[in-house]
Structures are given as C-alpha cells and as structure tokens.
C-alpha cells in the first residue's frame, strides 16, 4: 500500500510540473537566394543568436523573397509580417534622408569605411531620429559601385545618352549629371532589363555580378568611386519589445558594430569572388578612369553632394560628422 501511495504521489508531481515553453519564433526575411557570403553571414548571426538564447527564441531565416523582397521589406517589417528583415535602403531612401550620406560619391574609399562610419552616426544619435518605426540591428554597405555595361566607358562623353539603372535618390540625381538617363530598377530586374535593352548599364558592386548573372549581359566593368548601395537589418519594434529577456540579450549581444563587422567580412569575400571570377572570364574587361578623367567625374557630381546638404535636415552637420568618422576608421586601420 505504501508503495502504491508513493507511486500515485509521484505521478501527481509529474502532472503538476510545468511544461517547458516552446521558443518564441522570430521570422527573419531575406530578399534574395541563399547563395552567397552575405546570406552565410546572416545565417551565422542567426545561429549565434539561437545558441546564446538557449531555447528562449528561435530565429529562422526565410530567403528567396518568401516573406518580402527589397521593394516591400520596409513595410513588411514595420507592419509585423516579418519580425526581422534585411534589404537595401534604395526603395525607401526618402524615409532616411540623413542616412543617405552613406551613398554620396567620392567620400568613403571602401565599404568598410562607409559601413563603420554610418553605424557610428547611428550610435551617436546623429541619424537615430530616422529609425522610429523599426529597430536597426546593423547596416550593410555593399562594395563600391562598378558600372557594368554593354559597351566600354572611358570618359563622360561615353556616358552621354546612355540609359542607366538607379536605386535611391542620390544615384538618381548623380546619373543625369554624368550625361546619362536614370531608369529606376530593383536588383531583381537588372538582368532582363539589360537583356531587353531597357538599360545600357547598371551601377552595382562586384557581388552583384554572380548574384544576378550580370556577366551574361555585360562585358565592360568600370571601377569609379561613385558611392555605395546601403542596406539595413532591422527588427520590428513590437517584436523586439516582446522578446523574452534571454532572447533580447542574445540579439543585443550579436548586433550593432559586431554585426556590421561580420557583414563587412562577408562583403569582402563577395567582392573578391565577383571581381576575380569576372576577371578570369574571356570577353570581360575591367577598367578604371585615368586621374584627370576621374577628376572631371568628381567635379560633375559635386553638386549632388551640395544639393544633398541643402535638402537634408542638418545636412552640413551630418556630412561633417560622417567625414570625421570615415577619417577615424581610416586612421585606426
């Protein structure tokens, strides 16, 4: 009888014990295919966060535009369809006028300088007021723009009359000053637009060549410091606020500057892969402007920066602060 009572008591204790709660699900929307180092960087971040959260949350990546693409990522994240999203700023550049400082021509020399300087502006509160609708976890700056074209470009004269794709306000203002016509396109539209002759050239970083197969529709690649495409990784405000403490601590630990640096390393890899692969291909030509011609290009687009300063709230201060941060990154290297 005593054994029976003990067994019944044991069963009662098991029944009364609380079940372990399932981890809170966090949907991370990724706009393109999972086939490059940048996605691997996002996956590495996801794995580190999940491990550190120890079951409190489970971040899951949804690549390939399943939840959102570059054109609607901002709305999907701020609207809560996705908890976290990565996308380029281009489609919503008007929402982030100060943050567009990272896209200006002839400022930072490379994506590392640009990304770290831009994140420093956010951390110091200089551009933070633009991020009220979601919580940024990192900024992404893609390797510097290269003009991928069907015909060679050696000078401003060669640009005259060309139709060139643009993303974002700054590039849209810059291209006409170089004598070409801007055509607004999303990254996923580049290949077919080149193939059909809707555009003659596309300014994109080297990683875009293998990602969008640009080598199949262009043969000439001009490296000129026309600025950078920038992007964000951000979490919905409500999703962030509702995270269990261990989940929030895990996300915070691996976000910010450390996440920016992780994505810089991914971009380094993609730039090398894209450029090296293109260089090795038959029929592909990589070129740079001579110093005198580059100076003419810089002079031609200088009004874009001047206009940006005038049109942007506190623009002069933001640009000066950005230049200070770029110089600080450069000096610390």
Segments predicted by a language model, with ranges:
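N-terminal secretory/targeting leader peptides
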Residues: 10, 21-113, 122-124, 129-333
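A solvent-exposed, acidic/Ser-Thr-rich amphipathic alpha-helical stretch
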Residues: 116
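Positively charged n-region of N-terminal signal peptides that target proteins for export
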Residues: 1-4
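N-terminal signal peptide c-region/cleavage motif recognized by signal peptidases
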Residues: 14-18
């Amino acid at each position: 009888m005593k054994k029976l009572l003990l067994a019944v008591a044991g069963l009662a204790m098991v029944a009364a014990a609380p079940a372990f709660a399932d981890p809170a699900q966090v949907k991370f929307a990724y706009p393109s295919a999972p086939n490059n180092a940048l996605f691997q960087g996002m996956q590495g971040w996801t794995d580190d966060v999940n491990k550190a959260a120890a079951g409190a949350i489970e971040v899951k990546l949804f690549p390939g535009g399943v939840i959102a693409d570059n054109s609607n990522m901002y709305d999907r994240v701020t609207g809560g369809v996705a908890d976290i999203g990565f996308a380029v700023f281009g489609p919503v550049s008007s929402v982030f006028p100060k943050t567009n400082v990272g896209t200006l021509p002839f400022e930072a020399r490379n994506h590392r300088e640009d990304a770290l300087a831009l994140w420093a502006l956010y951390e110091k509160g200089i551009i933070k007021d633009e991020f009220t609708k979601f919580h940024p976890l990192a900024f992404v700056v893609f390797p510097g723009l290269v003009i991928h074209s069907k015909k060679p470009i050696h000078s401003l004269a060669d640009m005259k009359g060309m139709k060139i794709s643009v993303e974002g306000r700054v590039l849209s203002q810059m291209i006409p000053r170089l004598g070409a016509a801007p055509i607004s396109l999303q990254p996923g539209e580049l290949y077919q637009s080149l193939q059909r002759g809707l555009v003659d050239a596309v300014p994109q970083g080297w990683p875009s060549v293998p990602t969008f197969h640009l080598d199949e529709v262009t043969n000439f690649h001009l490296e000129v410091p026309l600025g950078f495409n920038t992007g964000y990784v951000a979490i919905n405000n409500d999703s962030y606020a509702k995270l269990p403490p261990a989940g929030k601590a895990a996300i915070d630990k691996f976000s910010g500057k450390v996440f920016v640096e992780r994505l810089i390393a991914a971009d380094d890899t993609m730039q090398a892969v894209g450029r090296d692969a293109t260089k090795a291909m038959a029929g592909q030509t990589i070129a740079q402007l001579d110093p005198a011609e580059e100076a003419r290009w810089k002079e031609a687009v200088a009004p874009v920066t001047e206009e940006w300063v005038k049109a942007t709230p506190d623009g002069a201060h933001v640009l000066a602060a950005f230049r200070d941060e770029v110089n600080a990154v450069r000096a610390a290297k």
